[in-house]
Amino acid sequence: MTDAHEAPWKPKFNPWLIALTVTMATFMEVLDTSIANVSLPHIAGSLSASHEESAWVLTSYLVSNAIILPISAWLSTIIGRKRFYMMCVALFTTSSFLCGLAPSLGMLIFFRILQGVGGGGLQPSEQAILADTFPAAKRGMAFAVYGMAVVLAPAIGPTLGGWITDNFNWRWIFYINVPIGILSLFLTNRMVEDPPFLKREQERRRRIRADYVGLGLITLAIASLQIVLDKGQEADWFGSPWITATTILSAYAFLIWIVWEWHHPNPVVDIRLFQRRNFATAMFFSFTIGIVLYGTTFMIPQFLQVELGYPAVKAGEALAGGGFAMICMLPIVGALVSRVDPRKLMAFGFISISAGLYYMSTVFSLTMDFRMALLIRTLQLFGLAFIFVPQNILAYVGVPREKNNQISSMNSFMRNVGGSIGIALISTSISRIGQQRRAFMVAHTAPGSPAFENMTNGLSETLKRQGASSADATRQAHGMVSALIDRQATTLGYVEVISILAVIILALVPFLLIMKRNKPAVGDQAVIH
């Protein structure tokens, strides 16, 4: 019986039990991308390392994780998806335990690399498993479950990491993965299975010579890019020779890889899928949403902690509220996507996010309180719920089911790369715009100007009443005005970047016209309508 006329495959166990099983490990993996952020000072102190050295605890994980994402589809096909997924869970769980035991920073970084390798295959594997386990008409709800894990985990990561570190020890942010990983291994072995068409593809691939050149090129390109994005701001970007050289290396490796993969009969990553308009547009959306989602996830706690003096746990709570709001919306969108044109849902989502960002730009100030921070994050993620599920659905439209691994792998990769680029660009833009605004404000608040004199005189009188001498009061007043200018200039940098993001998201709406809607087909991929 040919693939075209093969009866629809159904798993032996309830699809929802399978969905919950594969979501557990994915949730812990995504959680680990952010849970260590607030624990870095404790890790550095415990292991006698500087802040710059301890930052490699994050960078090492992100680099190895990013390398595995695009090649996970190839590895799934070669090894077998279930076997590959279980190997990833086992490696992630074991390396998490070893991270907790690490006696030195060097050993911790090494184990974090292994943890990133194991974790990199979990997101795309889960998405592919869900796509094959559920019929096309029910994928919306399945992807809603996946979305809960991907969105909630980074939102609560800093809060959970701060709470664990404050109440126990930083090593427990790694130990908590172990029992969940063991449970995931047991349930996966029991419930998950590879569909027949995937097994046939695996047998076919075994007789084909592996594309080691493509594998080497994409590894070099992604590792170089991730290091540039993570260390660029710290090294003054292209003012640093090694950042410039690494950027050139990454660009050339990507270009050569694209040409090589395009002409290779059995590539590691099937980039010819970008010839399909739905797939290409969905990946563009995934990349852009990654910029905004991860960028704002970086911006809000950064502003609350640095400019407003919030503790890390409290800043993390501002993100968690939005994550819980999205969890409430995802099942609703999952149900709507089979009844409403997904493109209309995405248009509503883009407009909602853009409006939320615009509102955020109007209230983002040094007087913003916690409730306002919670509200603006909730407005953003409310709109994102209307994009996440439909975008995942439309990415599969018209693509053979044998390519499900490739779709899920590339989707996760584009979102994560967009996030890395977004954080780097946003961080740099805030700094550069802030410097420009500070120069402008200093020029208009120089000694002698009425505004400057009124402010410094008022502060000086207050300090004198508190016991400071006239000279000390004047000097301290000048310092306080300078610090206020710095904070206000930085805030303006945030506001301008947020406004730019609002325009970018709104500009995505016309691109929906490129996509063709899906019409669920029984037992096969959704077909184009």
Per-region residue spans from a language model:
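Short, Lys/Arg-rich, polar N-terminal cytosolic tail immediately upstream
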Residues: 1-10
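Hydrophobic transmembrane architecture of multi-pass small-molecule transporters
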Residues: 2, 53, 416-517, 526-529
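Transmembrane core module of solute transporters
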Residues: 13-79, 85, 100, 106-109, ...
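Structural signature of transmembrane alpha-helices in multi-pass secondary transporters
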Residues: 29, 58-61, 65, 92, ...
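Residue-level hotspots within transmembrane alpha-helices of multi-pass secondary transporters
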Residues: 38, 70-71, 155, 159, ...
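Helix-loop-helix hairpins in multi-pass membrane proteins, especially solute transporters
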Residues: 69-214, 324
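Small-residue-rich alpha-helical segments with characteristic i,i+4
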Residues: 143, 152-158, 162, 373-457
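C-terminal membrane-cytosol helix-exit motif in multi-pass small-molecule transporters
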Residues: 179-198, 219-230, 249-263, 509-516
